[in-house]
A protein has these predicted regions:
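Mid-length scaffold segments of soluble, non-membrane domains
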Residues: 99-131
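Secondary-structure edge/capping motif, primarily at the C-terminal ends of alpha-helices
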Residues: 72-77, 121-124, 128, 160, ...
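Charged, amphipathic alpha-helical oligomerization/scaffolding segments
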Residues: 57, 61-64, 85-92, 105-116, ...
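Extended amphipathic alpha-helical interaction segments
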Residues: 126-160
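Immediate post-signal-peptide N-terminus of mature secreted/exported proteins
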Residues: 44-81
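N-terminal, post-signal-peptide region of Sec/Tat-exported proteins
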Residues: 71-98
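Glycine-rich, aromatic-bearing surface loops/beta-hairpins
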Residues: 2-3, 14, 163-204
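Secretory targeting and sorting signals
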Residues: 1-41
Length: 204
């Protein structure tokens, strides 16, 4: 069955609720940062976990939107890849970032991880049509939520210039990702994608 445009399906409502929660978290993280380019700030009193964990949390919440994006694209005949949209995202974060090159590398991983989940879901729905979504979320609305998370993630990255080069970065991100994935009840494919999304956060 191909999906129809509707918001009455309970599973889609749950996914939209996750996106709304994502927007709320993004709003909190953005509060007080002001507009314009995100600049790296010196490490304050909080430890590396407190500074790095928002990157893992926001990455997990961004990844959770892949289910909605996959549902929106399902049955349209179009590909998962959207080079125009991807370039728009990368150009926007480059303009906002204090470290454009590093931030763009991180967001490339974010985009590829999101597409990994979309493809996995489409393969599952091809094999198990009964699990496929019966309604199609509004992709523009979903992307608006993703954009809010993107803004917060750019700022979270900017706050961690020193921590991303520290020896503890990888371990802290791993622990943060496990916690964030558990809170969102991400399954194995989502967790694999989450780890991919964080692959360029720590500097060599």
């Amino acid at each position: 069955m191909r999906p129809t445009s509707s918001r009455q399906n309970p599973s889609v409502r749950r996914l939209i609720a996750t996106a709304v929660t994502t927007a709320a978290v993004a709003t909190v993280l953005l509060a007080g940062t002001g507009a314009g380019t995100a600049r790296a700030v010196p490490a304050g009193n909080p430890g590396p976990y407190a500074r790095l964990s928002p990157i893992a949390e926001l990455s997990a919440r961004r990844l959770a939107t892949a289910d909605l994006v996959a549902a929106a694209k399902w049955g349209t005949g179009g590909p998962v890849d959207d080079p125009v949209r991807e370039r728009q995202v990368l150009d926007e974060v480059a303009r906002e970032a204090g470290e454009p090159a590093a931030t763009v590398r991180i967001f490339r991983d974010q985009i590829e991880a999101n597409k990994d989940v979309q493809r996995a879901l489409h393969r599952r729905w091809d094999v198990r049509p009964s699990e496929a979504p019966s309604v199609r979320p509004d992709l523009a609305e979903v992307r608006a939520e993703i954009n809010r998370v993107n803004h917060a993630l750019v700022r979270a990255i900017a706050r961690t210039a020193q921590d991303r080069g520290a020896p503890c970065c990888g371990g802290v991100l791993l622990a943060s990702a496990v916690q964030a994935g558990g809170e969102l009840r991400l399954d194995a494919p989502h967790m694999t994608a989450l780890h991919r999304s964080l692959g360029s956060v720590c500097r060599p």
